[in-house]
Amino acid sequence: MKTFIGIMIPFLGTALGAACVFFMKKNLGNLVQRALAGFAAGVMVAASIWSLLIPAIEQSEGMGKLSFLPAFIGFWVGVLFLLLLDRLIPHLHVGSNQAEGPKSRLGRTTMMVLAVTLHNIPEGMAVGVMYAGFLAGNAQITAASALVLSLGIAIQNFPEGAIISMPLRAEGESKGKAFLGGVLSGVVEPIGAVRTILAAQLVIPALPYFLSFAAGAMLYVVVEELIPEMSQGKHSNIGTVFFAAGFSVMMTLDVALG
C-alpha cells in the first residue's frame, strides 16, 4: 500500500494543478507562469542531486576512485535518451508557436500535452527506481527517502498541471477538456513507475546507473524546457527567486525527512 500511495502522489499533484482551470477565470499571467516554472525547476534540480545523483555515487563506493563512473554514464544516457525522444515525438512547448520534432498534423492542444507528457517520463522512472530499491531491501533507500522524492515531484507537478491546463483553456478548450489534458500529461508517471518496479530484477543490480539516468533526464527537462520558460519575456528575477525557493524546499525535504 505504501508503494501504491508513493507512486500515485506525483500524479495527484498534476491533477490538483490541472484543477486550477476550474477556479481561475483568466490565463496565467507571464510573471505567474515564470514563477511556477522556476519553482518546478528548482525542485527538479534539488531532487536530481540529493535524491538521485548523490545516492548513485554513494552506492558505487566499492569502486574506489571510479565510484563516479556509474553516475557519469547513467547521467549521460538519461540526457541522450530525452534528446532522442525530443527528436522523435512531435510536441509544442507552452508559450511557443514553433513545434519541435518531426512534422505532424497533430493539433496544437495534442502537441502541448505531448510536450509535458514526454518530460514526465523521467519523473515516473525516478519514483519507480526509488521504490524498486526500497522493495528489494536496499539499505541506502528507505521508505522515507522514496516518499520524499514522490512528494517533491508532486510539489513541482502542481504548477506543471496548471501550466498546461490554463494555456489549453486559453486556446479555446472547455474547462473539462483543459483539465483532462493536464491530467493526461501526468498519467505517464505512475505507469512509468510501475513498469520500472516490475523490471526490478533488471534495475536493482544496476541501481546507480538507473538513479543517475533519471537525474540526467530530469535535468535535461530543466535546461531544455523550464529555464527558457522562467526566463522568457521582459527581464525579471521572479523565475530565479522561485527557482531558489523550489530548490530550498526539496533540499529541506530530502535532508530533514529522507
Predicted regions and their residues:
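Intrinsically disordered, metal-sensing/regulatory segments
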Residues: 1-258
